């Protein structure tokens, strides 16, 4: 018996590395010192551009969205999801992404599938001037089934310590600007999959009420907000805090970037919740609180700013084809504001 007989094909792994080389190296900036194939990725940190450079790291996956995406052959899209989930986290403190690493684990190496995944990762990186510096593809027979894979991503960025965005400058009456999501993004899919299991004709019913393809809408890749945030900051517009709206929705994620003596007042009438979310709520009979604490409901990212910058930010978002709007404001925390300003769903 040899390694291949036991389920690990070393030669197929070598061929896969060769096939992804063009996509990976297409993301490399001038700071990448060497190509793929070494034991470690080498990256020259652009310290000359910063007074006190601070590295910022983030890691994430795509969750159980992978199960549904793999069954519908949305492999390229989940590659973008992987980059988005990591990159959107690290940019909240003002960091510019430098490089990305990926980890792919599978029961049996399907080069056609995983090439699409890596192409998606490369696309997400390339669109955001972030080098795909390296990765690992692990063939694990008996641990994963042959037609399944899992993904993890790791993103590293850089910011000047004096320009860190941490919410400490937030004050009363600052505005909260919402940036529209691309759909469900990569959270809540354990609930989504259960709803699908319990409703055989869900895709046809959705198409009937929306005239949209259910799985095309459901599996849209997570929006990456790096470029729009980077432009806002490059125009010397102060952002006091940012929040990536992921698992836990607005109620869980927005308060994370706000000092404890303030709370966010969210005007829930300031936007129309997209039809996909309403459809899932109806078909899954999801309670209101769970609805808000599971999905982003059309809000993928939030900025907290002084009101003087509102129009400039909305215009920049428009230039990037991202819908944005004033979703609320910051109020000082006390018993009266909690009962007066926060809707019941957010308490």
Curated annotation (Swiss-Prot):
Record-level GO cellular component terms: cytosol
Xref: CDD domains: PurM (cd02196)
Residues forming coiled coils: none
A Pfam family this chain is assigned to: AIRS_C
Compartments where located: Cytoplasm
Class of enzymatic activity (EC top level): ligase
EC annotation from Swiss-Prot or TrEMBL: 6.3.3.1
GO biological process: 'de novo' IMP biosynthetic process; adenine biosynthetic process
Catalysed transformations (reactions): 2-formamido-N(1)-(5-O-phospho-beta-D-ribosyl)acetamidine + ATP = 5-amino-1-(5-phospho-beta-D-ribosyl)imidazole + ADP + phosphate + H(+)
Principal location listed in the UniProt entry: cytoplasm
Gene Ontology MF annotations: ATP binding; phosphoribosylamine-glycine ligase activity; phosphoribosylformylglycinamidine cyclo-ligase activity
The entry's keywords: ATP-binding, Cytoplasm, Ligase, Nucleotide-binding, Purine biosynthesis
Pathway assigned to this chain's UniProt record: Purine metabolism; IMP biosynthesis via de novo pathway; 5-amino-1-(5-phospho-D-ribosyl)imidazole from N(2)-formyl-N(1)-(5-phospho-D-ribosyl)glycinamide: step 2/2
Protein family membership: Belongs to the AIR synthase family.
Alphabetized PANTHER family for the sequence: TRIFUNCTIONAL PURINE BIOSYNTHETIC PROTEIN ADENOSINE-3, TRIFUNCTIONAL PURINE BIOSYNTHETIC PROTEIN ADENOSINE-3-RELATED
Protein name: Phosphoribosylformylglycinamidine cyclo-ligase
Species per Swiss-Prot/TrEMBL record: Prochlorococcus marinus (strain MIT 9312)
